[in-house]
C-alpha cells in the first residue's frame, strides 16, 4: 500500500515538473516575442522619426540643364522652382549650354557644395555616366530628366519618347500619306538617347504598319538649328521627292522649315516638343502640320517629387515616363 502511494506521489510530482517545464517554456517564448516586437516597434519609430526629421529639413538641389535658352527647359525650370518653393528647398540651377565639359564642372561644383541631390539633363548620354558615378561616390543621389544617361541614376523622368515617335508616324499614316505610300525623312540628334528613341519609334512603326512609306533619308543635326536647315536643303537636293520630314526637336523643325520654304517644296513637317514657335506655325496652316507635344512642367514637377520621396526613405521607380500627345490644326492654341 505504501509502495502504491509512493508511486502515485512520484507520478504527480513528474506531472507537476512537466507542467512547470511547459509553463516555463511558454513564458520564455512569450518574453522573446515581446522583446522582438518591442525592437521592431522601436526600429519603426526610429525610421518614422528620421522621415519626419528629413521632411522638416531645407534641402539644396543642384540642377544642370542641357540648355537654358531652349523654351522646353525654361518650362522645366519654372515648374521645378515652383515645386521647390512649396517644399521650402533651394535650387542651384546651372546652364550647361550643350557642353559636356561644362556640365561635368557643374556636377563637380555641386559635389563640393555638398548639395542634397543632383539633377542632370545630360548633354551627352554616354558622358553623363561618369558624372553620376562621381556624385554617388560622394554619397549624393543623382536624378536625370528628359535625356537618359548610360549611367544609373536613382530615377529618370522623361517623356515616353518611343511612343512620341510612334504618334508622329501614326499621324503620317492617318493624315498625310493615307494610301500608305510615299517618302519620309528624319532629322535626328544621334548624340542624345531620347532623340534616338523618337527616331526609332517613328521608323519602327512605319516598317510594321506602312512598309510602302519609305524612310529615304536620315541625317543628324546635333542640336544646331542652322545645321538642320543645311541638312534639309541637302535632303531636298538628294531625293526626288520627300512627302514628310519628322524632326526630333522643334529647333530642327524650324531649320527645316526655312529650307523647305526657300525651295518652295511641298514637304510636310512634324516637329517634336510642342514649343510656342511650332504651335504658331501649325496655326498658319502651312508646311508644318503637326507636333508631338511634351509636358515639360510635368517633368520638372515629377522630378522634384521623386527626389522628395527618395530623401524621405520611400522607394521610387527607376524610370517615370510621361505620355506625349499630338498638336495639329484641330487643337493648336
Identify the function of each model-found stretch.
Residues 1-11:
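Positively charged n-region of N-terminal signal peptides that target proteins for export
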Residues 13, 17-333:
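A residue-level marker of the well-folded mature domains of exported/periplasmic proteins
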Amino acid at each position: 500500500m505504501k509502495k502504491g502511494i509512493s508511486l502515485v506521489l512520484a507520478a504527480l510530482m513528474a506531472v507537476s515538473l512537466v507542467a512547470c517545464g511547459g509553463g516555463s517554456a511558454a513564458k520564455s517564448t512569450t518574453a522573446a516575442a515581446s522583446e522582438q516586437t518591442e525592437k521592431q516597434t522601436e526600429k519603426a519609430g526610429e525610421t518614422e522619426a528620421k522621415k519626419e526629421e528629413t521632411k522638416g529639413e531645407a534641402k539644396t538641389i543642384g540642377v544642370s540643364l542641357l540648355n537654358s535658352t531652349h523654351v522646353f527647359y525654361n518650362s522645366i525650370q519654372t515648374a521645378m522652382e515652383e515645386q521647390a518653393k512649396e517644399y521650402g528647398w533651394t535650387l542651384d540651377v546651372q546652364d550647361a549650354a550643350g557642353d559636356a565639359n561644362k556640365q561635368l564642372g557643374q556636377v563637380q561644383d555641386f559635389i563640393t557644395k555638398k548639395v542634397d541631390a543632383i539633377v542632370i539633363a545630360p548633354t551627352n548620354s554616354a558622358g553623363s555616366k561618369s558624372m553620376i558615378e562621381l556624385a554617388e561616390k560622394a554619397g549624393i543621389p543623382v536624378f536625370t530628366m528628359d535625356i537618359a544617361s548610360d549611367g544609373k541614376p536613382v530615377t529618370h523622368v522623361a517623356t515616353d519618347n518611343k511612343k512620341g515617335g510612334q504618334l508622329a508616324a501614326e499621324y503620317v499614316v492617318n493624315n498625310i500619306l493615307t494610301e500608305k505610300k510615299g517618302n519620309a525623312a528624319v532629322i535626328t540628334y544621334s548624340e542624345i538617347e531620347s532623340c534616338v528613341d523618337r527616331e526609332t519609334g517613328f521608323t519602327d512603326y512605319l516598317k510594321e504598319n506602312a512598309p510602302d512609306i519609305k524612310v529615304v533619308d536620315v541625317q543628324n543635326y546635333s542640336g544646331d538649328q542652322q545645321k538642320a536647315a543645311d541638312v534639309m536643303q541637302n535632303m531636298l537636293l538628294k531625293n526626288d521627292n520627300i512627302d514628310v520630314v519628322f524632326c526630333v526637336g522643334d529647333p530642327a523643325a524650324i531649320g527645316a522649315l526655312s529650307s523647305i520654304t526657300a525651295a518652295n517644296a511641298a514637304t510636310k513637317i512634324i516637329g517634336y516638343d510642342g514649343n510656342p514657335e511650332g504651335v504658331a506655325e501649325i496655326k498658319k496652316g502651312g508646311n508644318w502640320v503637326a507636333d508631338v507635344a511634351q509636358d515639360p512642367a510635368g517633368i520638372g514637377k515629377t522630378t522634384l517629387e521623386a527626389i522628395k520621396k527618395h530623401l524621405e526613405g520611400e522607394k521610387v521607380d527607376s524610370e517615370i515616363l510621361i505620355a506625349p500627345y499630338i498638336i495639329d490644326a484641330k487643337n493648336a492654341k
